Regions:
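Non-heme di-metal
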Residues: 1-153
Length: 153
């Protein structure tokens, strides 16, 4: 099979993934607004379409990654993405917004950047738990609640 990396097809897959992902979010926002406005049927159609877009995005994601990466790889990727967002992206966006006189937008970029830092830290802690085999181990007595039925163990 030909090498996908660096090809126009890879660029197209990235664009398709981004487009479908953005459409999914947009349609969920539209669904919320339609529901708030009293249009249940329209809200339902937006949500249905959002789920379709999610599945389309998943097709492109899997092709880009030769399948679905394992959880450790996903945590590493998520942490790296969050790190970029809080160290480079939002910091740079805030600086530009301030320079252009958009102080409120700059504040929002900075505030979201702080949240992204917390996201990175959370992913790194979860990754460490897997690496140290402590996902299901805690000191002292612990109660576990079933995420499906709610039973407490």
């Amino acid at each position: 099979m030909k090498e996908l990396k660096g090809s126009q097809t890879e660029a197209n897959l990235l664009a398709a993934f981004a487009g479908e992902s953005q459409a999914r979010n947009k349609y969920t926002y539209y669904a919320s607004k339609a529901k708030k406005d009293g249009y249940e049927q329209i809200a339902g159609l937006f949500l249905e379409t959002a789920e379709n877009e999610k599945e389309h995005a998943k097709i492109w994601f899997k092709l880009l990654h030769d399948g679905m990466p394992d959880t450790m790889e996903n945590l590493k990727d998520a942490a790296a993405g969050e790190n970029y967002e809080w160290t480079d992206m939002y910091a740079g966006f805030a600086k530009t917004a301030k320079e252009e006189g958009f102080d409120k937008i700059a504040y929002l970029f900075e505030a979201v950047g702080k949240i992204e830092k917390e996201h990175e830290e959370r992913y790194l802690k979860l990754l460490a738990n897997i690496e140290n085999n402590t996902v299901f181990v805690r000191d002292g007595e612990v109660y576990w609640q079933c995420r499906n039925c709610g039973h407490i163990h």
